[in-house]
Structure formats: structure tokens, C-alpha cells
Amino acid sequence: MNFYQISRITAGIGIIFLMLAACQQPSEECLSIAFTGDVLLDRGVRQQIRRKGVEHLFESVTPLFRSVDATVINLECPITSVRSPLHKKYIFRAEPIWATALSQAGITHAAMANNHTIDQGRNGLTDTNQYLLSSGITPVGYGDTSSQSCRPVLIKKGKIEVVLYNSVALPLENWVYLENSPGICQQPIEELKEEITNFKRQNP
């Protein structure tokens, strides 16, 4: 297996893309993955969507996303019609009808373990998972229990395999951690590093 540990991808102005290409040998088949920074569909972006449509947001990057084997975004908002905001400073929400546009743009995976997919509470979080799945997008860093939320996601092409981990290390404002309820992965970095090491050892 080929493994890549991605610690942080930081977006400044605009979006920064990280491209990974995993190859058995230079002349053999490759697995290419694009990673983006935050994808937020609220605030000023919501106004742009109202004016030009959600598809317009991805026009310039859709060819790239569709040219690789997988595209992983950091989804920086819940996708839900639920309006049950947590008591926190910044609250975001995306409309469910926009989820399909993400898939049509070539997005295949969405990292959910961050400080904003929880903005509309646990119901909004579970909605997000369902809307992603129904649009053909694989959630990463989410599960029906705390242990399930930290399970890695496999991306495979032929004999090439890449495993994705997604965990949030930031303190989550007014979010209640419940071990046996739907949630996002909140595994400390040192534990995550140890798990990756063990996984690599068990899957050489």
C-alpha cells in the first residue's frame, strides 16, 4: 500500500490545491488525488450562488477535478435545511439542493471533521452525511459513533491504495462529545499518528 499523512492544508487567498500521485513504478498506473482547502457555501459565497448559480463556483476547477481519480474537499459548512444553530460566534449552512453540484464538479470525498459541519447541531450533521452520500460523495471523518467517525477511508485504483484520515484538533465551541451518537472524529494528533503507524505496520 501507499500511504500519505496529510497534517494540514492551509488555504490563504483563494484555494490551494495539493496533488498526490501514487505509482507502483514510474511507468505503471498512477492514482491521482486533488485536495482542496475549505469549501464554504455561505456568507458572501451564498450571495454569489444566488446571483450566478452554484455551478458557477466550480467552473474553473471542474476540469481539474474531473481529470483526477479523486478530489477531496474540506466541507466547511453543514448541508441541511435544519436551522438549529449551536451557540457559537460563526454559524454556517448550505442548502441541500447544492449537494449535487459538488458531485457534478468532480468532488468525490468530503472531510467532515472540522469546526463548522457541526454548526446546525447533530441533526444538521447527520443531514450532511446523508446529502453527501445521496450525491455520490464519500464523507470522511464522520460516523454514527465516535469510533466509526475515525475510521479511515480507502481510495483504490487497481493495485494502488491510499487511505484517508480526517480528525479535528481544534476545540469545538459548545459541541457535546457523545461516544455512542453521530459525530465527527476528534482524535488527538498523537493518537492519530499512532493509529496510522499501526495501520501501516499491519498493512505493509
PLM region spans:
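Intrinsic low-complexity/disordered segments
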Residues: N2, A21-A22
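Bacterial N-terminal signal peptides that target proteins for export
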Residues: N2-A11
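Bacterial N-terminal signal peptides
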Residues: T10-A21
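Acidic, metal/ion-coordinating pockets
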Residues: C23-P204
